[in-house]
Amino acid sequence: MRAIAFFLCAIVVVSPLSAQQQVITDLPEVRGPFTLTAVYDSAAGHNAFAYAGKTVPPVIRVLPGRVIKLRYANNLPRKSDEECATGRCGNVSNLHFHGLHVSPERPQDDVLTMMSMPGEILEYKVVVPSYSPPGLYWYHTHPHGESARQDLDGMSGAIVVEGDASRLVVESSMKHERMVCVSKRSP
């Protein structure tokens, strides 16, 4: 059976949660340099992002023309019992900054050669262009062959490029930000 993933950050209607699901009403936010860690969450039984002692990915907030400085530590186990697209998963990992018009070169958004094996660290310095429109973007793992499993586990988060959104918002009642991030992996 195929695993099904769902990641969405938007205004949505959410059905009641089962006893095992949880709603986190205050997502952590970061505006400056920070460390994000890939870990195995034994309580949840899958891989996750860890930030500030919790397995909840932070919302990255940035202004156009600024730099996202991020240290990404791969603390995933060296061995995995799961199968990936190319065989046994090796828990290699990296990050992709989806939707941002940024350089595909190191140390920005190089998803092809910038990889970390378990125990390794990657340093990202992502320059958000000054012409970037305000809006909602996202980051997620992107190692080809393994990203589906990692993304299905919830190894993704939101990026908010801040700025003057008045030209984008017509109704004054819509000027209040509401963000819902949903991520789900079926067994």
Regions found by a protein language model. Name each.
Residues 5-15:
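Bacterial N-terminal signal peptides
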Residues 78, 134, 147-149, 167:
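Short beta-strands and strand-coil junctions in structured, solvent-facing domains, enriched
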Residues 149-179:
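Extended, polar beta-sheet/loop recognition surfaces of beta-rich domains
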Residues 73-75, 142-146:
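Beta-strand-rich extracellular modules
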Residues 127-133:
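Short, surface-exposed loop/turn segments at beta-strand-coil junctions that are enriched for proline
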Residues 136-138:
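Short, conserved beta-strand segments of beta-strand-rich sandwich/propeller modules, principally
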Residues 17-116, 121-123, 170, 176, ...:
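N-terminal, post-signal-peptide metal-ligating segments of extracellular/periplasmic oxidoreductases
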